Every structure is written in C-alpha cells, then in structure tokens.
Curated annotation (Swiss-Prot):
ATP binds at residue 270. The lineage of its organism: Bacteria, Bacillati, Bacillota, Bacilli, Bacillales. It comes from the Bacteria. This is Cysteine--tRNA ligase. It comes from Geobacillus sp. (strain WCH70). Its main location: cytoplasm. It catalyses: tRNA(Cys) + L-cysteine + ATP = L-cysteinyl-tRNA(Cys) + AMP + diphosphate. The gene is cysS.
Length: 466
C-alpha cells in the first residue's frame, strides 16, 4: 500500500495516494501555448511535475505522462499577424525551442505531447456529444458550454455559481445565453486559421482541447491532473465541467497545482519589464542551478526569484557535488573493509529513509534537499577517517546518484579530471624532492585556485575538492 500523501486541490486536504489501477499512474499536465519561448514561471511547472513523475517512478509506479501543446489560439494568431508568418510555422519553432529548454533543465519528455491541431476531429466529436446531451449550444457558428446545467460547477475552485455570476459579463458581440457560459468552438474570422465543422469553419476554444486530449490518451478518469495555480479557474474548472458532463465519471482523482513565481518580490509581468525567458537565463547560469533553485521551495508555495537566491542555490548544489566527487576520488585509496562499515552503512540507510519520508509527504523537495545536505555532511565526516572502505564509499555514491536523479540533477564530471590532478601532484612531489619549493608552492596555489586542497601526510599527498 502506498505511503505517499498528496494535497488535492479538489478536496483541499492531503490524501493517501491510491491510483485507479495498482502501480500505474495516469498523469496529465497542461503544457504551454507555443507563441513564444517559455518563461521561468512555465519552467517551474515543468520542473515540479517532472520531479513528481520521477519520484513516482522511483517508488515503483509505471507512469503514463501526457502534456499538451496549444498550437492554435488567439495569442498565436496575433503573433502570426505581427510577424507575417503562418500559425503552424510559429508553433513548430517554439515547440522545438520548448524541447531544447526543458531538456537543458533536466526534464524528461512526456510519453505523449499531443497538439491541438492534430486532434481537431476528436475535439469536434467531443463538442457534438455535449450539444446532443444539452450541455452546449450553437449560435451563429460559435458553440458555448451551458455552465448552469453542470450542477457541480465551481467545485475545484470552491466558488458558488452565484458568486461567479456576480463577476461575469457578456462582451459586446457575444450571443451567450448566460454570462458564465464559455466557448467550445469559435467561428472563423476572415484570414484566420480554421477547420471545417458541423457548425461551419472555426477552431476550438482553449478549455475543450485538454478535456478531449486527456480522454483520448488517458481514458475517462485520470489519476493526476496538474498545472500552475493560475489554471485552477477557469481552465481546470471548465475541463471538469466538460469531461464529467460527457462521461458521467470523475475527470481526475487528484488535482495538483504549483504556486506562483515572483521576481524580486514582484509578480512577473511584461508591463513591469521583469519577464524572464528560460531561453535567455540558461545562457547566463547553469540550468541545473535553476532546477535546484526551483526545487528548494515546496511546490505549492510561492517562490521568489532573485540573483541572491540563485547564488545560494548554486553554492548548495556545489556542496553536494563536491562531496560526491571527493568520495569518487577516495575510492582509489580505499580498502575492502574497515571495522565500522556497518555503522556508516546504517547512517546512509537512515538518510535514504528520511528522503522517502519527506517526499512521501506531498513531494516535499525542500525537505528532501535538506536530507541530501545531511548525507553530504555524513560523507564529509567519513572522508576525515584515516581508513575508508570501498563498500561504504560505493554506498554513499549510489545514494547521491539515486536521490539526485529523483530531483533530475545530473552529476557531471568536474572540469579538472582526477588524472590531471594526480599528474600535477606528481610534478609537485618531484619539485619538493629537488628542493624547488617555489615550483612546488606554485603548483599548490594553482590547484587551490581550482578548488583542490592538498594534505601532505606520511603516507603521501592526499587531495580533495574544497
């Protein structure tokens, strides 16, 4: 039985995770509208839900992960007009850019990345069924969802229909029955990209695409539906209304939403000029640092993006990597066994269990990272031992590799290779033997500048990364 507990936006409480089918998870994550490069707010969602997927797989679940592309909508049509290009060309360019960005950030591709334009027939069929059942109606080529007919409308965002009605209004030119009704199909305007339908030429509304594609690739009911907090209403609320009206079944068992991202304590917006694109920022900083930073705060909490906090994340990640590479280096001088192996192996197991405990509690990556720092501290203490064993070193290395892989952090080799360091130490030893202390000091300083610390012992010169 699962020990994972997750916070469900639908019920506003933590619940024991019990997928519909044992050991299998069907997960749908709302993807980007591909009219531009993704910004760091999009990146947070991509990183968070990639990590949750990785953790579920680490715990033995088989995850089918679907994340869509909105490759036709008002923003794309506007961009096409401004750039003098067609919508498919712009969409394709930014889909490829999206893959480049998320790959740099350590995110795995989804099992399926459906596009709206490749699923028009599925969407039309879905809309027609809603019309047949009285949940939708057509007016002059537009099709609207009859919101009041769905009695549970507002259950995800915890708003009553009357509260919503008070803030709703009908725009000029709209022919809706009710201000709360929303578009499922939009009649084509002159010069716009469009498709044939039973209601004339047009294109899908935003909300219907996710309902149709989630059902096509994952079935009537899915385990986890996820996205940014800003999508809770109206997007996810409308998805529930559409899908449950069609199937008569719950659309998703668990709803997960990541918190907002602020820039220097201000909301990110183009008008404030603080809009940060992933494409730009990863030219300036290591993408792994950006990922580590995003995971340093619980996914449901707001996160504040600043240079100071990024620098702190960079130093934290360097601490973990330094411990890891110092362990790798010590393997060369370790023995088969030492007397206190079992004691150290027990400490490593404690950290393994602590990591699982924290991540089982609503995927708390912030506390999971704290466990990794404790593992690093234990590793550093072990490296102070006069004699170290291969068995313990390997156990530490495996633990670092396994837990960092859950967080999507790769352990790449340092720029200065062990062989290069050993060659410089050999050169320094010869210089000392020949009483060329100036050269010996120069080599020590050169290594120190590369964060390599030397320790001269009766058994020879040892080194470690600082």
């Amino acid at each position: 039985m699962s020990s994972i507990r997750l916070y469900n936006t639908l019920t506003r409480k933590k619940e024991l995770f019990e997928p519909l089918e044992p050991n299998k998870v069907k997960m749908y994550v709302c993807g980007p509208t591909v009219y531009n490069y993704i910004h760091i707010g999009n990146a947070r969602a991509a990183i968070v839900f990639d990590t949750i997927r990785r953790y579920l797989e680490f715990r033995g679940y088989e995850v089918k992960y679907v994340s869509n592309f909105t490759d036709v909508d008002d923003k794309l049509i506007k961009a096409a007009r401004e750039l003098g290009e067609d919508v498919p060309t712009i969409a394709e360019r930014f889909i490829q850019a999206y893959f480049e960005d998320i790959t740099a950030l350590g995110c795995k591709k989804a099992d399926v990345h459906p596009r709206v334009t490749e699923n028009i027939d599925t969407i039309i069929e879905f809309i027609q069924t809603l019309i047949d059942r009285g949940y939708a109606y057509e007016v002059d080529g537009d099709v609207y969802y009859r919101t009041r007919k769905f009695k549970e409308y507002g259950k995800l965002s915890h708003q009553s229909i009357d509260e919503l009605k008070a803030g709703a209004r009908i725009e000029v030119g709209e022919k809706k029955e009710d201000p709360l009704d929303f578009a499922l199909w939009k009649a084509a305007k002159e010069g716009e990209i469009c498709w044939d339908s039973p209601w004339g030429k047009g294109r899908p509304g935003w909300h219907i695409e996710c309902s149709a594609m989630a059902r096509k690739y994952l079935g009537d009911t899915i385990d986890i539906h996820a996205g940014g907090q800003d999508l809770t209403f109206p997007h996810h609320e409308n998805e529930i209304a559409q899908s449950e009206a069609l199937t008569g079944k719950p659309f998703a068992k668990y709803w997960l939403h990541n918190g907002y991202l602020n820039i220097n304590n201000e909301k990110m917006s183009k008008s404030l000029g603080n809009f940060v694109l992933v494409h730009d920022i990863i030219q300036q900083i290591d993408p792994q640092v950006l990922r580590f930073f995003m995971l340093s705060v619980h996914y449901r909490h707001p996160i504040n993006y600043s240079e100071e906090l990024l620098e702190s994340a960079k130093k934290g990640l360097e601490r973990l990597k330094t411990s890891y590479f110092n362990l790798k280096h010590r393997l060369q001088s370790s023995t088969n066994l030492t007397d206190d192996d079992d004691q150290w192996l027990a400490r490593i197991q404690e950290q393994h269990e602590a990591f699982i405990r924290e991540m089982d509690d609503d995927f708390n990556t912030a506390n999971g990272i704290a466990v990794l720092f404790e593992l690093s501290k234990q590793a550093n203490l072990y490296l102070l031992e006069k004699n170290t064993s291969e068995r313990v070193i390997h156990a530490f290395l495996r633990e670092f590799e396994q837990l960092l892989d859950v967080l999507g952090i790769t352990l790449q080799e340092e720029e200065l290779l062990d062989e290069e360091i050993e060659a410089l130490i050999q050169k320094r030893n010869e210089a000392r033997k020949n009483r060329n202390f100036a050269l010996a000091d120069q080599i020590r300083d050169e290594l120190k500048a590369k964060n390599i610390i030397l320790e001269d012992t009766p058994q020879g010169t040892r080194w470690k990364r600082g």
